[in-house]
Amino acid sequence: MTDIIRSDAATLAAKIAIKEVSSTEITRACLDQIEATDETYHAFLHVAADEALAAAAAVDKQVAAGEPLPSALAGVPLALKDVFTTSDMPTTCGSKILEGWRSPYDATLTARLRAAGIPILGKTNMDEFAMGSSTENSAYGPTRNPWNLDRVPGGSGGGSAAALAAFQAPLAIGSDTGGSIRQPAALTATVGVKPTYGTVSRYGLVACASSLDQGGPCARTVLDTALLHQVIAGHDPRDSTSVDAEVPDVVGAARAGAVGDLRGVRVGVVRQLHGGEGYQPGVLASFEAAVEQLTALGAEVSEVDCPHFDHALAAYYLILPSEVSSNLARFDAMRYGLRVGDDGTRSAEEVMAMTRAAGFGPEVKRRIMIGTYALSAGYYDAYYNQAQKVRTLIARDLDAAYRSVDVLVSPTTPTTAFRLGEKVDDPLAMYLFDLCTLPLNLAGHCGMSVPSGLSPDDGLPVGLQIMAPALADDRLYRVGAAYEAARGPLLSAI
């Protein structure tokens, strides 16, 4: 079983195709690992053992009959962040207000996974409605980092990242609003990608901030992440923000990058994202070593200035709460989810107020209040409107940078994983943890976090963030795969 759960997805898929191992064996091994370890890590909110084994058996039947498999990852099981709707298991978004709720339909991303023959092991833990950087805001308890049980796995999608690091699944799906895929990947020594906004359908992705949210792939290698990216990306007419454009050849780029030649690739180091107050020395040392490695691979490295990045955090934490206050208005105790106080003696307004008070956690309430204030008649121009102007300037900074470089790089996070409870009572410190990742969400561009080693400060994982323009996701995979190959294998968490 150990060999199976520690294998990469591409290897497992190849073995399934030649009947060296069955999808059922792989899926059962993952389920056994979840059963043996998840009491410790709490990566999963719901485990769908019967459904996953049925999907695996269907792939095995196709293999036995000599039928062509539906995708390059057919039969390889996956952990799904509990923010994507699934018709056959609960979708809670880490919130009490949706406890036990089952969607009547699958998200487009979920449907594409099923069509690709990928068994879904279950739904992973997350910060409530994807609001947080540590997975401590989940109404169902925190997830622990497999590298150190006293540390957070990142957020909001810490469950998916922890499942990968704990060898509970070879593949995972996350969503990224301000770094929720990339940041947990950095803290757990896994690979996570935020695709270009609009290239992976948001239909059935329960909204946090609609102009920022983007589903994306997570795995333990760059190639596995590319293979999963290829499955989930593509135009969806049911999503009004979906981009009708050809999906870049991310798999081809990953395979080409693995050769380890970056000659002719121009890499920009973002001056605003590598140093200054709040950066851990070990993270900076790891980043500098990664830049040296890229140079050794033949890349042309230069420093790039993105002056408005200094205002990205302030703009983000006005735009995001504003969209949250609008999106979460739908949880009104009338149509679905929790209902409190409906005993026939209270008005609809009273029931709604009681339900939202009981169903939402402190961080969600905080962001609803901030957003409502920012959108109010007297303050809209002073706050929300100004934040949107800064957003435009950040996008222009990136556009200008890409006229002289092909990709940008930075640390994924300013520090390694912090201790559980360390930032719970200090929201600003928690928000600062997204400093390096959120500019890409504001601009709609794509980004990857790839492991860059362990910090000399505390021996915990550090991530290298690679950034590219919209619809140039293949550049991430070429550079990421080349760096991964040169870096060599890392020690595992367990």
UniProtKB/Swiss-Prot annotation:
Catalytic reactions on record: L-glutamyl-tRNA(Gln) + L-glutamine + ATP + H2O = L-glutaminyl-tRNA(Gln) + L-glutamate + ADP + phosphate + H(+)
Sequence similarity: Belongs to the amidase family. GatA subfamily.
Key words, A-Z: ATP-binding, Ligase, Nucleotide-binding, Protein biosynthesis
Cross-referenced InterPro entries: Amidase (IPR000120), Amidase_CS (IPR020556), Amidase_dom (IPR023631), AS_sf (IPR036928), GatA (IPR004412)
Top-rank lineage group of the source organism: Bacteria
Gene giving rise to this polypeptide: gatA
Complex formation: Heterotrimer of A, B and C subunits.
Family matches, as NCBIfam families: gatA
A GO CC annotation given for this chain: glutamyl-tRNA(Gln) amidotransferase complex
Catalytic residues as annotated in Swiss-Prot or TrEMBL: 81, 156, 180
Name this polypeptide is given: Glutamyl-tRNA(Gln) amidotransferase subunit A
